[in-house]
A protein has these predicted regions:
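Active-site bordering "gate/hinge" segments
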Residues: 1-207, 218, 230-282
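Short beta-strand elements
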Residues: 210-228
Length: 282
């Protein structure tokens, strides 16, 4: 539990942060408004058309709570495991192909050369979670669409929603600190040993709905799966790229704030913690 002094300090910091959040929101909304009016952007020294429908898709939205929390223990939870299914990437994405267009002037270092082999079926690194049989978008816009009737579409709609959440987040922190009771009962006051049935929790994180599923029996984990926001968003992001000039594809992808590694440093150690192999993968 936190001391009263710690709660007071966090409260003061949250109040300071609220002022900064309003400044950040106003500044970024002005920047986004300017971008929405543009007909083109410059990429690699070339003018590229900027569609008004950049990042549009016709998929649904999913959110379990209006802010960074959950409704798992409510009578009517905001997420239902019966509505979720998983599809393997090799059953979802296209098979082998090759790059047919290249631009050496594209930042940074140019694009992949013509003829480069690709195979999304085998190279995709995540499964494809579906809700009610279809891909969904999760994240700031999904929360505002679900709970506040937000209707801004496309890439700019995602950025606008993210800015609007800044202040809501700080207000939520302040309200939580006002209600905090260090002597209150904890939600999980014991460690369940489990009977092998499925347990789950769907919590809203900044990037979107974060679902964890587990089966535990006699204190041992039998099954564990994480459906993190980026995993939900990848299939929808792919569809949002349809029709966009390839030079601005990165703008669409970044609208989802994907949690993906730019590079992976793999290290293999033995029982004596001696490094026996390592590889840097980009």
């Amino acid at each position: 539990a936190c001391t009263k002094q710690a709660v007071t300090k966090m409260y003061d910091l949250a109040k300071e942060g609220l002022v900064l959040a309003h400044e950040q929101m106003d500044f970024m909304l002005a920047v986004i408004s300017n971008m929405k009016k543009r007909d083109w952007v410059e990429v690699g020294g070339k003018q590229v058309p900027l569609p008004k429908t950049l990042g549009y898709h016709n998929q649904g939205y999913m959110a379990a709570h209006p802010m960074y929390a959950s409704t798992n223990l409510d009578e009517n939870p905001g997420w239902d495991p019966e509505r979720w299914t998983d599809v393997r990437p090799w059953d979802w994405y296209m098979g082998e192909g090759e790059v047919s267009l290249a631009d050496p002037s594209y930042p940074i270092g140019g694009t992949s050369p013509v003829g480069t082999k690709v195979n999304p079926q085998m190279e995709a690194c995540t499964g494809v979670p579906l809700y009610d049989g279809a891909p969904v978008e999760v994240g700031p816009r999904a929360r505002l669409v679900t709970f506040k009737k937000f209707d801004e579409k496309g890439t700019w709609g995602q950025h606008i929603a993210r800015q609007l959440e800044y202040t809501d987040c700080l207000y939520s922190i302040i309200n939580a600190l006002d209600e905090y009771n260090p002597d209150g009962k904890v939600v999980a006051d014991y460690i369940p040993q489990g009977d092998g049935s499925l347990g789950w929790a769907a919590n809203e994180a900044p990037r979107g709905t974060d679902v964890h599923l587990a089966k535990v029996k006699d204190g041992r984990v039998l099954y564990y799966e994480m459906l993190v926001p980026t995993t939900w968003n990848f299939p929808t992001c792919s569809r949002a790229l349809t029709g966009a000039p390839w030079q601005v594809a990165e703008m669409v992808v970044r609208g989802y704030d994907p949690c993906v590694s730019c590079a992976t440093h793999m290290i293999v150690i033995d029982e004596d913690r001696k490094v026996i192999a390592q590889k840097f993968i980009q």
